[in-house]
Amino acid sequence: MSDSEATTSTDRSESNSTATIHNPEESRLKALLEPAVLASRLYLEDVSIHVAGSHRTVHVVVDLPQEETGGVSLDAIADVSRGLSDILDNDPHDDGRPYDLEVSSPGVSRPLTEPRHWHRARGRMVRVNVIQGDNLLGRIASVGDDAVTLIPEHEVKKGMKPKQGEPITIPFDRIRQGKVEIEFSHLHEAALEDEHNGPSEEA
């Protein structure tokens, strides 16, 4: 099974109109589910709850630890989904309303908003919007606690080999936005991640 983004869903009921809530229940569920995610050697990125009438969808986003590269495999998504479903089914503080459980991993196009996101993207080409500075296109060479080092790549005419500049270190607090650029060498990987971010699989 290739490393890629995946989504698994456990269907409990049907829904009509959809709304999103942000409340302490999400924090409670994150604390409840995190040990099982860590036991699966994954990182719990986010837990969100979407409500449609009396029905809920619990969306859990998991990722690999920051020192690893690649994507979360479909097998890993399926395994952790089963464990999380069991925990939710036996949650003593649950109000008993029906729910769907959706477990997914971040897509390659997610914004790089935390240091761990930059660690996960090591070696990738990124486009960076710098506060009070020029926008940069470069490859991530290394990531520290407070900054990222890029090897700039200067865009040239079509058909010409890109020119690399000297490494430059940018503090995270000077980065307004960062995003991975899709390269031809990563097209297959990106296509798999996009594919598995689509319709859910039954758990």
From Swiss-Prot:
Annotated compartments: Cytoplasm
GO biological process: ribosomal small subunit assembly; translation
Bias (Polar residues): 1-21
GO CC annotation: cytosol
Ranges where the record places region Disordered: 1-23
Alphabetical list of Pfam families matching this protein: DUF150_C (PF17384), RimP_N (PF02576)
InterPro entries: Ribosome_maturation_RimP, RimP_C, RimP_C_sf, RimP_N, RimP_N_sf
SUPFAM superfamilies found in the cross-reference section: YhbC-like, C-terminal domain (SSF74942), YhbC-like, N-terminal domain (SSF75420)
Keywords noted in UniProt: Cytoplasm, Ribosome biogenesis
Family statement drawn from the similarity comment of this UniProt entry: Belongs to the RimP family.
PANTHER family for this protein: RIBOSOME MATURATION FACTOR RIMP
Protein purpose: Required for maturation of 30S ribosomal subunits.
HAMAP family: RimP (MF_01077)
Name under which the protein is recorded: Ribosome maturation factor RimP
Organism the protein comes from: Paenarthrobacter aurescens (strain TC1)
Gene: rimP
